[in-house]
């Protein structure tokens, strides 16, 4: 029948081709739209990432949050434009670095290094004081109008002696620690009492075997570790205080004597003649005295310079004494009663 022929698929090739073409076109159209949307999204994300990177670079390298650029609400620049991200005071890294930089160097510096630095400054000041006592190269310092106002010979001797002793101690400390004669025991485990002074000492590797000290005195292992008899550290009666403690105590005595000398006679080291430095200008000059010392005002200028230099010396001495007190207390477990300088 004709009805059967109409229902046969083989008799409808045109309808089948139409349906296939329609389905194919619909699928291609839908796929191209999805691809276009994905491409647009990809381009937007690339633009957003570029903007975030540029904002991070302009903010000084605060790129910690750039990885979170694709925000859910599309506002990817919110994190980059946040004032707190660009505020240096709220940046934890630089802030901690600044705090470290602002800490007083004296608190971070090793006490021994601080002590040696102050002693070097003190040596320079004392040398300047000695040079000031010798105007025009007069070794005896009698040049202020012949009035002996400075008492140069006596004062120079006191300062020169203190300077020499301080330089000796500075050399001991800089040469591997005080008590170098037995400092080797610190490494070999023999420096039980004064082990703190043994680091870097002369003959440290042979400390337990009795390594040679500074002047050749052998350290007899645990028995004589830290002995400073060979390091010129006990010539003032402090032989019983071995190692670093003895040297620090000797330095304390030297500084106390220096302070007393300066308090009694200043940098001149003696009592001025009647009339003081102002009257020295008209006094008859001694033989070999500097002619410039008789000019009006020269004695006043020298006195002003001496007072300024003396003030600087006293300031450094006070700082040295503070460090010495701390180091002596640490050496003796806080039981050491060290002598402090008298106030100016």
UniProtKB/Swiss-Prot annotation:
Residues 138-156, 268-279 have a biased composition (Gly residues). It is found in: Secreted. Keywords: Hypersensitive response elicitation, Plasmid, Secreted. The keyword Membrane does not apply. One of its GO terms (cellular component) is extracellular region. It comes from the Bacteria. Residues 8-28, 65-83, 215-235, 280-294 have a biased composition (Low complexity). GO terms for biological process: symbiont-mediated perturbation of host programmed cell death. Disruption phenotype: Remains fully pathogenic on sensitive plants, suggesting the bacteria produces other pathogenicity factors. Residues 89-108, 295-311 have a biased composition (Polar residues). Its main location: secreted. The keyword Zinc-finger does not apply. PopA2 and PopA3 are produced from PopA1. Residues 1-28, 58-108, 134-156, 211-242, 268-311 are annotated as: Disordered. Acts as a specific hypersensitive response (HR) elicitor. Has activity on tobacco (non-host plant) and petunia but is without activity on tomato (host plant); PopA3 seems to be more active than a PopA1-PopA2 mixture. This is Protein PopA1. It comes from Ralstonia nicotianae (strain ATCC BAA-1114 / GMI1000) (Ralstonia solanacearum).
């Amino acid at each position: 029948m004709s009805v059967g022929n109409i229902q046969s698929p083989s008799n409808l090739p045109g309808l089948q081709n139409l349906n296939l073409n329609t389905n194919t076109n619909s699928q291609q159209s839908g796929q191209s739209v999805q691809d276009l949307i994905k491409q647009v999204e990809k381009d937007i994300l690339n633009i957003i990432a570029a903007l975030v990177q540029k904002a991070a670079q302009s903010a000084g390298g605060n790129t910690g949050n750039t990885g979170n650029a694709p925000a859910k609400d599309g506002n990817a620049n919110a994190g980059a434009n946040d004032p707190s991200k660009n505020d240096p005071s709220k940046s934890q890294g630089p802030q901690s670095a600044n705090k470290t930089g602002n800490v007083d160097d004296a608190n971070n510096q090793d006490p021994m290094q601080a002590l040696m630095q102050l002693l070097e400054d003190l040596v320079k000041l004392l040398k300047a004081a000695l040079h000031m006592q010798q105007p025009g190269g007069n070794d005896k310092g009698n040049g202020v109008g012949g009035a002996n106002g400075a008492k140069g010979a006596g004062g120079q001797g006191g300062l020169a002696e203190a300077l020499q002793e301080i330089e000796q101690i500075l050399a001991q400390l800089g040469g591997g620690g005080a008590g170098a004669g037995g400092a080797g025991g610190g490494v070999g485990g023999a420096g039980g009492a004064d082990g703190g002074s043994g680091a870097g000492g002369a003959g440290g590797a042979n400390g337990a075997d009795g390594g040679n000290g500074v002047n050749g005195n052998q350290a007899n292992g645990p028995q004589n570790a830290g002995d400073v008899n060979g390091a010129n550290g006990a010539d003032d009666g402090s032989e019983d205080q071995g190692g670093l403690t003895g040297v620090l105590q000797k330095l304390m005595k030297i500084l106390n004597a220096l302070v007393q000398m300066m308090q009694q006679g200043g940098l001149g080291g003696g009592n001025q003649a009647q009339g003081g430095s102002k009257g020295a200008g008209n006094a008859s000059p001694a033989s070999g005295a500097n002619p410039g010392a008789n000019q009006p005002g020269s004695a006043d200028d020298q006195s002003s310079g001496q007072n300024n230099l003396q003030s600087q010396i006293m300031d450094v001495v006070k700082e040295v004494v503070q460090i010495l007190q701390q180091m002596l207390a640490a050496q003796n477990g806080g039981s050491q009663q060290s002598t402090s300088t008298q106030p100016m």
